[in-house]
Swiss-Prot record:
The lineage of its organism: Eukaryota, Metazoa, Chordata, Craniata, Vertebrata. The keyword GTP-binding does not apply. Heterotetramer of two alpha chains and two beta chains. PROSITE patterns: GLOBIN. CDD domains: Hb-alpha-like (cd08927). GO terms for molecular function: haptoglobin binding; heme binding; iron ion binding; organic acid binding; oxygen binding; oxygen carrier activity; peroxidase activity. It comes from the Eukaryota. GO terms for biological process: hydrogen peroxide catabolic process. It comes from Stercorarius maccormicki (South polar skua). This is Hemoglobin subunit alpha-1.
Length: 141
């Protein structure tokens, strides 16, 4: 459960990310594909090379979902309901991949904003990313 402090920390991070969300989304995917090659299996039709238009486009979608969740932090499940349906009913992505994506997003934030990612903010952002992953997999059951 996200505390009031956690919510403020998450909003602060997304405030710093600002106009870089799409870039960070693509960078997160590239990092995930490189670090966890098994995640590539969900994208057999993608050009997964650095700078790929397909990775950038999907990174934009990932970033938009995270921004949407942060903007509706008191109702993440409502904000991501359609995306949850898509992942549960059509895409059937293994739930562990959301954790891997979250780890990679944390690394990207740390690279670009090292002073922002204090231990407290890191913990809050990790809790938020876990909450997003839980919402995206809630309808699998």
């Amino acid at each position: 459960v996200l505390s009031g402090s956690d919510k403020n920390n998450v909003k602060g991070v997304f405030g710093k990310i600002g106009g870089h969300a799409e870039e960070y989304g693509a960078e997160t995917l590239e990092r995930m594909f490189a670090t966890y090659p098994q995640t590539k299996t969900y994208f057999p039709h993608f050009d997964l090379q650095h700078g790929s238009a397909q990775v950038k486009a999907h990174g934009k979608k990932v970033a938009a979902a995270l921004v949407e969740a942060a903007n509706h932090i008191d109702d993440i499940s409502g904000a991501l309901s359609k995306l949850s349906d898509l992942h549960a009913q059509k895409l059937r992505v293994d739930p562990v991949n959301f954790k891997l994506l979250g780890q990679c997003f944390l690394v990207v934030v740390a690279i670009h904003h090292p002073s922002v990612l204090t231990p407290e903010v890191h913990a809050s952002l990790d809790k938020f990313l876990c909450a997003v992953g839980n919402v995206l997999t809630a309808k699998y059951r």
